Amino acid sequence: MLAGGRLRWWQWRGRDCAVQSQMVVDAHVHLHPERLAEAIRRWFDAHAWHIKYRAGVDDAVRTLREGGVARMVALPYVHKPGLARALNDFTLDVSRRNPEVVPCCTVFPGEEGGEEILEEALSGPFRGVKIHSHVMKIAPDDSRLDPVWRASGRWRKPVVIHCGPEPANPGYGLDTRTVSGADRLRRALDRHPDAIVIVPHLGFDETPQFEAMLAEYPNLYLDTTMVVGAFFARQPDVDILRRHPDRILYGTDFPNIPYEWDHELKALRTLKLPPRDEEQILSGNALRLFGPDAQ
């Protein structure tokens, strides 16, 4: 038992967790206010897939908690200026109601007061920053992101940036390859070598290019979100998990997914990684990167 009578991750009586014997941290979840969440669901319904989990934030947290997930890293993101501060406040409130939630902040690059928003958030309880190149229509090496990279290096907190080209979905209203790619991130990191960066989805479909960067940029990491469970017709070489277990985090995109919450967890388990490697991917790397609030 934990302080206050809360159960440890393996003691919940919900659905069996795909990995019952070790701590699981989902390093990629989205917990948005209902109005924004509904708009996101409509977008996915029109352009991608039908989201399976459509209840509110607290129900989403409960689903993961009762399944055995010990911590979940909340990654808010905005599509236009003027929304970040309120969304950050919402995310922090969710984390205060649900101690399993590790709050990250967001900012719209270049917006008025953006640097102040970052400083307020990262000097406080927020454990990282979420940027989405497709949604925000901004490439990693765009100068408007320089304050984000600087803040990451200064506060030693990661930036989770979706900057792999896929999904190249016309619903974004642009050619995603114009704002993404390993080379664009490389240019940003050459300017800001102290920034800590997590690229979701193993950087698909430029996974080999992002993997090649791991040796050169020690602060670069990848996550597994939606690319180890064979949902898409194409997926990256999952043996990357064997080659770099210390640089990859487990994540899901929950609740914005078309299948059971543990679909990818079970797929990862079937890889039969060495126990130490599996532990690093499922929790160790996330605990190290997101700091004491994730412990």
Model-predicted segments: where are they?
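Mid-to-C-terminal alpha-helical segments outside catalytic/metal-binding sites
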Residues: 2-30, 36-71, 244-249, 258-295
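Active-site neighborhood of phospho(di)ester-bond hydrolases with catalytic His/Asp-centered motifs
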Residues: 24-27, 75, 104-105, 130, ...
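Active-site environment of divalent metal-dependent phosphoester hydrolases
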Residues: 32-35, 79-82, 110-113, 165-169, ...
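Short aromatic-enriched loop/helix-cap "lid" or pocket-rim segments at secondary-structure transitions
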Residues: 35-40, 85-87, 117, 171-174, ...
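A general structural detector for well-ordered alpha-helical segments in enzyme core domains, enriched
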Residues: 59-63, 87-94, 117-121, 144-148, ...
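A structural motif corresponding to the C-terminal end of an alpha-helix
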Residues: 66-70, 98-100, 188-196
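Active-site gating/metal-coordination segments in enzymes
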Residues: 70-71, 79-168, 220
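Catalytic pocket-lining loop regions of alpha/beta-barrel enzymes
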Residues: 127-128, 142-249
